[in-house]
A protein has these predicted regions:
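Cytosolic juxtamembrane regulatory segments of multi-pass membrane proteins
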Residues: 39-58
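Cytosolic regulatory/linker segments at or just downstream of nucleotide-handling modules
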Residues: 173, 196, 202-245
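Cytochrome P450 core scaffold surrounding the K-helix E-X-X-R motif
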Residues: 177-180
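A structural signal for short, well-ordered beta-strand segments
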Residues: 67, 119, 164-170, 240
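Short, conserved phosphate/pyrophosphate- and ester-handling motifs at nucleotide-, phospho-/glycolipid
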Residues: 42, 71, 233
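Catalytic NTP-binding/metal-coordinating core of nucleotidyl cyclase/transferase enzymes
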Residues: 56-138, 186
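Transmembrane alpha-helices and their extracellular/periplasmic helix-loop junctions
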Residues: 1-40
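Alpha-helical scaffold within the catalytic cores of cyclic-nucleotide enzymes
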Residues: 92-109, 125-166, 170, 191-204, ...
Length: 245
């Protein structure tokens, strides 16, 4: 009989090495996912991504998504009051952002970025989200309600009220890791994103705190027609609506 002990040992050795390398690769992938998405999506989504990293397509893909922009309106009185106390001003902004962000994440949204006191969020990436338009709408309405509660707290603390404008739009865009070889972020590009930002900035013009495009409308809400707006590069105007309080 041939002595196969050496062969078995060698096979076991290489199997151990392969298993260890696979473990390290998976560990690094999970750590990278937590680092990249841990503060931008809900903990449940992070766990799902860590469990199955193949769900991610970080290289870039085209898909229908829903976008939400929210920004503080009339920030000047607050900034003027605390111009000599920048730490207090930052604290107020952070309390506002936390108040609003928790609601977005609760409804499956991803925080793309903060731009000062502005929040940009989207639905349907990095994971597919069912009823993305409805979840964005529910989030916006809950954000409105939560801000009212936060303003009551601010009032008791002598802090001026915060008012916001919010824009929601849905459409095709490109999503994935974007940036230079030294720094990149998971973000989006497309006309649908730009329109959502434009709707948010138009809230003051239409004296409302929420504008939703016709592409994001869902059943079950009492929409009030506002206007038709022409989007750069498009021949057909887009109908825009609000949902009254």
């Amino acid at each position: 009989l041939l002595d196969v002990t050496g062969t078995i040992f060698i096979a076991f050795f290489f199997w151990t090495i392969a298993t260890f390398r696979s473990f390290i690769t998976q560990f690094m992938m999970r750590r990278q996912i937590k680092k990249q998405f841990g503060t931008y999506v809900s903990p449940d989504l992070v766990k799902k991504l860590q469990k199955d990293p193949s769900l991610l397509r970080l290289g870039g893909e085209t898909k229908r998504m829903t976008f939400l922009f929210s920004d503080i309106r009339g920030f000047t009185p607050i900034s003027e009051k605390y111009q000599n106390d920048p730490q207090k001003l930052v604290e107020i902004v952070n309390r506002f952002l936390t108040n609003q962000t928790e609601i977005i994440m609760k409804h499956g949204g991803t925080i793309d970025k903060y731009m000062g006191d502005c929040i940009m969020a989207f639905w349907n990436a990095p994971l597919d989200i069912e009823e993305q338009e409805r979840k964005a709408t529910v989030a916006a309405l809950e954000m409105r309600e939560a801000l009212g509660e936060l303003n009551e707290i601010f009032k008791n603390e002598g802090i001026p009220e915060i008012h916001t404008g919010c824009g929601i739009n849905s459409g095709l865009c490109v999503v994935g890791n974007m940036g230079s070889s030294n720094r990149f972020d998971y973000s989006v590009l497309g006309d649908a994103v730009n329109l959502a930002a434009r709707l948010e900035s138009s809230c003051k013009t239409y004296s409302t705190d929420l504008i939703i495009s016709e592409y994001s409308m869902v059943d079950g809400y009492d929409y009030q027609f506002l206007d038709e707006v022409t989007v750069k590069g498009k021949s057909e105007p887009v109908k825009i609506y609000t949902i009254t309080k």
